[in-house]
């Protein structure tokens, strides 16, 4: 049995239905768990110009199918759910430096989700980049400013690193 009760799904449906069409495009609602995706009408115009938008949108659908209530606001961040801001990164990075840059870019959000394909290789590269960025920020405790890092692997979001566990990796 799942954790999705009738009341939770109905509450989610009311939240989704309350979004005004002049501000939000209602992209998807999952009747089985109450997960949904809604995109700000202005984000749709800007986002079409960005690379990786298809992966970002499909990732939001995966998360909604896992019961997440996803709002995609105009501008930054890429998404808002679970009371936090999220930045999506496609894992087409060639080296550790490009991954570190992606992590620094994602610092505007509470969390980063790397959308990965080849699980072990890419996760190891992301871990190296995180370790490197922690090392660069360690002396002045600035590493605490780093966002928590997750990976989206085969339809599941998994924690990779978070501040509470500091120097240990979740995967």
Walk through the language-model features, giving the residues of each.
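Metal-dependent nuclease catalytic core centered on acidic motifs
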Residues: 1-70, 91-171
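Conserved catalytic cores of phosphodiester-cleaving nucleases, focusing on short active-site segments
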Residues: 79, 84-92
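Acidic (E/D-rich), amphipathic helical modules within compact regulatory domains
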Residues: 74-77
């Amino acid at each position: 049995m799942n954790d999705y009760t009738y009341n939770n799904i109905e509450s989610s449906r009311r939240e989704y239905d309350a979004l005004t069409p002049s501000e939000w495009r209602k992209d998807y609602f999952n009747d089985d768990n109450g997960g949904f995706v809604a995109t700000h009408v202005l984000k749709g115009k800007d986002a079409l110009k960005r690379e990786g938008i298809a992966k970002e949108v499909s990732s939001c659908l995966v998360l909604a199918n896992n019961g997440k209530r996803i709002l995609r606001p105009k501008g930054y961040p890429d998404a808002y759910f679970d009371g936090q801001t999220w930045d999506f990164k496609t894992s087409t990075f060639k080296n550790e430096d490009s991954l570190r840059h992606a992590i620094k870019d994602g610092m505007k959000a509470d969390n980063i989700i790397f959308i990965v394909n080849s699980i072990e290789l890419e996760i190891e590269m992301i871990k190296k980049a995180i370790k490197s960025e922690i090392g660069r920020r360690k002396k002045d405790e600035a590493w605490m400013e780093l966002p928590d890092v997750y990976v989206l692997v085969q339809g599941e979001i998994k924690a990779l690193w978070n501040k509470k566990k500091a120097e240990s990796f979740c995967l």
